Amino acid sequence: MAKADTKTKSSTSTQKRTTKAKKDPDAPKRPLSAYMFFSQDQRERVKNANPEAGFGEVGRLLGAKWKEMSEAEKKPYNDMANRDKARAEAEKAAYNKRR
């Protein structure tokens, strides 16, 4: 039995590529989440406790630790995230006024 012709044209070869807009270096930084503040705070401790763990494994350990935490334990990180969100919104408003 002969195989059917499976050759198809790639849609990417016929479509025009769009260029990604360059990011303004003066644009304000996005706010960090509570988990990201936790991750920054705990990453070295987790790496020291698990020296054989790679980058992905450390991330999984941090995620598991974050899920185990109570809301009271997460509160300092949530407060940091709220402050950072307010900072980012203020910087964005000032940035948009300049533009």
Curated annotation (Swiss-Prot):
GO molecular-function term, one example from the UniProt record: DNA binding
Similarity comment text for this entry: Belongs to the NHP6 family.
UniProt name for this protein: Non-histone chromosomal protein 6
Organism: Mycosarcoma maydis
Pfam families per record: HMG_box
DNA-binding region in chain numbering: 28-96
Top-level taxonomic group: Eukaryota
Cross-referenced InterPro entries: HMG_box_dom, HMG_box_dom_sf, HMGB
Keyword field: Chromosome, DNA damage, DNA repair, DNA-binding, Nucleus, Transcription, Transcription regulation
Function: DNA-binding protein that induces severe bending of DNA. Required for DNA-binding by the FACT complex, a general chromatin factor that acts to reorganize nucleosomes. The FACT complex is involved in multiple processes that require DNA as a template such as mRNA elongation, DNA replication and DNA repair. Also augments the fidelity of transcription by RNA polymerase III independently of any role in the FACT complex.
